[in-house]
């Protein structure tokens, strides 16, 4: 997007809906990094600043949120089952209580792979992805040498949360279900822009009359986010 009165001011806008499955934090991690790399390529081509919004299906205390907000994450201290900070059976976030998981995401210096849509996805030290057509026998011929592998992942963009920048916290909740009332939606921006104001989520006092959403009054299980920026 470009301002009509000043076409040199460009905003590259992205929106997403990350996988819901709480147990597949590894796929969520891959998704957000591939998405950020795509936006970075667009920025390199067109210039401007990036805004990224959507349903990330990760909570503010999660490892993936930390990666986006701080720019790096040590996967050796994070389990793929807790990367998104969401639990199916409990209405509270337990990620902070699980600092070091029994099964670390990085168990060995070999690239990890998984089958998804008949393709093998190979993870390297910076989560750059090499995708090969589906085969029963993965080919590690071009793998990164073990001495060059690292458990630290760097995020391709330097982003900040618009809500956290103004409120010093995320708005809560952005999703209201019977067994899960939490924040999973965000508007991220680059520092070249200045967030001026944001739209707050409904208060719990106003939501207490409902057991869950959607319902006859609220048509969605997510609440809208809105941020105003100065470019």
Where are the model-predicted features located?
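Metal-dependent phosphoester-hydrolase catalytic domains
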Residues: 1-5, 23, 30-33, 37-51, ...
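Active-site-proximal beta-strand elements of phosphoester/diester hydrolases
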Residues: 10-20, 222
């Amino acid at each position: 997007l470009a301002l009509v009165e000043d076409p040199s001011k460009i905003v590259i806008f992205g929106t997403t809906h990350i996988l819901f499955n709480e147990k597949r934090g590894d796929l969520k991690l891959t998704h957000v990094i591939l998405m950020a790399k795509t936006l970075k390529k667009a920025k390199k081509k067109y210039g401007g600043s990036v805004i990224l919004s959507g349903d990330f299906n990760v909570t503010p205390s999660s490892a993936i949120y930390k990666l986006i907000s701080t720019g790096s994450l040590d996967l050796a201290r994070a389990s793929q089952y807790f990367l998104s900070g969401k639990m199916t059976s409990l209405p509270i976030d337990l990620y902070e209580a699980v600092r070091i998981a029994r099964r670390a995401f990085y168990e060995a210096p070999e690239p990890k792979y998984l089958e998804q849509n008949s393709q093998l996805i190979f993870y390297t030290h910076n989560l750059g992805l090499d995708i090969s057509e589906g085969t029963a026998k993965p080919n590690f011929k071009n793998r990164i040498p073990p001495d060059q592998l690292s458990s630290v992942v760097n995020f391709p963009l330097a982003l900040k949360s618009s809500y956290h920048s103004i409120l010093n916290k995320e708005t809560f909740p952005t999703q209201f279900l019977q067994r899960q009332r939490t924040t999973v939606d965000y508007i991220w921006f680059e520092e070249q822009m200045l967030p001026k104001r944001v739209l707050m989520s409904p208060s719990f006092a106003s939501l207490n009359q409902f057991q869950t959403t959607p319902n006859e009054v609220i048509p969605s299980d997510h609440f809208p986010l809105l941020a105003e920026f100065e470019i």
